[in-house]
């Protein structure tokens, strides 16, 4: 099971952090930043979630959205850490993980150019970590209509990277499970789904 970890102070500009929530009736803080802080689990809460997962035989992991979160979650030593599409060109964070985190790194390629894909895989290869890298075909959107899923990208990723990385996966942002079955049939060995 995968959670998410963000450091709002690192991700938001001062102006964004201090702006009022766009829908104050749904806000958990006086500002948008305070609202985001309220929604985040602390590192101690993540440690507790990891413990509960392990007690019932589930692998715990977290998507990290910034350097602070990457360092905090790496300290918990999960089996894998996920890099969301929105952060996959945060090369300083990727380098830090290559240098300081020994587990598997799963990374989505939504919103990523082919040149960026090559740069990312090359970074992991140059650091001797490509065989710890799982890359995911992903169409960024919630929910993604079936016609926009771009499943055949799995074939392209397999052709280009299957022998260079640990695995090719599929990150589904669609409704239902039919697309997951098709992704598996096309060779995605890991299927990631979003429940919330």
Where are these regions (language model features)?
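Catalytic cores and adjacent flexible loops of soluble metabolic enzymes
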Residues: 1-196
């Amino acid at each position: 099971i995968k959670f998410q970890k963000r450091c709002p102070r690192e991700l938001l500009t001062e102006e964004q952090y201090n702006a009022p929530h766009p829908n104050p009736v749904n806000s958990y803080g006086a500002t948008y930043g305070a609202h985001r802080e309220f929604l985040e689990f602390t590192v101690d809460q993540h440690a507790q979630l990891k413990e509960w997962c392990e007690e019932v035989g589930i692998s715990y992991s977290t998507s990290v959205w910034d350097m602070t979160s990457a360092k905090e979650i790496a300290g918990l030593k999960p089996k894998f850490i996920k890099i969301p599409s929105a952060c996959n060109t945060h090369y300083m964070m990727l380098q830090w993980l290559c240098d300081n985190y020994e587990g598997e790194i799963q990374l989505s390629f939504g919103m990523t150019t082919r040149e960026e894909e090559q740069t990312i895989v090359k970074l992991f290869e140059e650091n001797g970590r490509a065989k710890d890298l799982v890359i995911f075909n992903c169409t960024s959107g919630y929910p993604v209509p079936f016609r926009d899923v771009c499943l055949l990208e799995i074939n392209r990723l397999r052709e280009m990277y299957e022998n260079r990385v640990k695995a090719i996966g599929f990150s589904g942002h669609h409704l239902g499970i039919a697309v997951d079955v098709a992704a598996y049939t096309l060779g995605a060995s890991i299927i990631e789904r979003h429940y919330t």
